[in-house]
């Protein structure tokens, strides 16, 4: 049996224990290194290379995205980062501020620049008129992210009000939604929401179905519920790993020091295809981008 592992050992380590890619390389497992960059170009690539080498990247004070060698990595120093991000989003013309742009945060909560703070603010800014129902935290049109692998009922629109989740009928099939998938709230009701993932529509119940007591059944095949989804205007850098967007806004947060290190910044900046804007405290960025934590993880895989 042959096994092929694909990954970047310089990106974020597992949230829990271990550093498997680092240890496999250290153990001398045969490996290759891909050199051609496909996702991005310009100063994003040079900045990531500098971070990887342990150097401080060069950050521009302006963008030039149309140049042959685009200037597409910029730092906007700000004492009120969310105010600055709001101004950027309202003035944005090249990229859709919701679906082509992603805000990345260091921490989930307990910071003015946390994921919770970002989503509370930018839901109001970017989706002020979305239809709401009491008891449901989302509104029609909201950007949401899946936080746990889920199997959900596939649905199709019947007739009537497209924003009413009760107007959607099951197709008889199921649809798998992976942890990290980003979708749009298409319809809403007191019992749940309809989410759109590309051409797929799924029903997300307000609560998980209860197991059936008869016939030894373990319950419905549906495994997801609204608790497995969160607003997605802002997500953490860890949740962003493996994804990409045309424009990425990364918040330089002094409160993110325990999370935002050299590997975190390398990962978040490299999520951007066309433009990456860092907003916030310059000194926090400069300290964090040179701090190493992955190399200090104590593991024993190489000794096995």
Model-identified regions with their sequence ranges:
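C-terminal accessory regions
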Residues: 171-172, 179-304
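Conserved helicase motor core of P-loop NTPases
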Residues: 1, 6-178, 184-186
């Amino acid at each position: 049996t042959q096994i092929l592992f694909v990954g970047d050992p310089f990106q974020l380590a597992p949230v829990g224990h271990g550093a498997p890619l680092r240890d496999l390389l250290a153990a001398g497992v045969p490996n290759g290194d891909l050199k051609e960059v496909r996702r991005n170009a310009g100063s994003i690539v040079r900045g990531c290379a500098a971070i990887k080498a342990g150097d401080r990247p060069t950050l521009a004070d302006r963008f030039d995205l149309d140049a042959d060698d685009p200037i597409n990595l910029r730092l906007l120093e700000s004492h009120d980062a969310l105010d600055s991000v709001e101004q950027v989003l309202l003035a944005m013309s090249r990229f859709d501020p919701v679906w082509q742009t992603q805000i990345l945060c260091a921490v989930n909560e307990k910071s003015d620049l946390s994921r919770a703070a970002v989503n509370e603010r930018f839901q109001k800014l970017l989706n002020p008129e979305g239809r709401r129902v009491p008891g449901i935290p989302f509104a029609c049109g909201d950007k949401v992210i899946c936080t746990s692998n889920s199997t959900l009922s596939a649905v199709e629109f019947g007739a009537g009000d497209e924003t009413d989740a009760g107007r959607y009928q099951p197709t008889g099939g199921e649809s798998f939604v992976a942890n990290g998938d980003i979708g749009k709230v298409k319809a809403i009701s007191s019992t749940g929401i309809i989410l759109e993932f590309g051409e797929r529509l799924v029903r997300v119940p307000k609560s998980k179905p209860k197991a059936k007591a008869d016939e030894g059944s373990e319950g419905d095949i549906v495994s997801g519920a609204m608790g497995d989804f969160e607003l997605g205007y802002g997500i953490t850098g860890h949740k962003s790993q493996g994804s990409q967007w045309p424009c990425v806004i990364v918040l330089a947060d002094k409160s993110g020091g325990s999370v935002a290190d050299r590997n975190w910044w390398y990962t978040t900046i490299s999520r951007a295809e066309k433009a990456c804007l860092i907003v916030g405290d310059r000194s926090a960025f400069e300290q964090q981008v040179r701090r190493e934590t992955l190399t200090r993880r104590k593991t024993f895989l190489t000794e096995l």
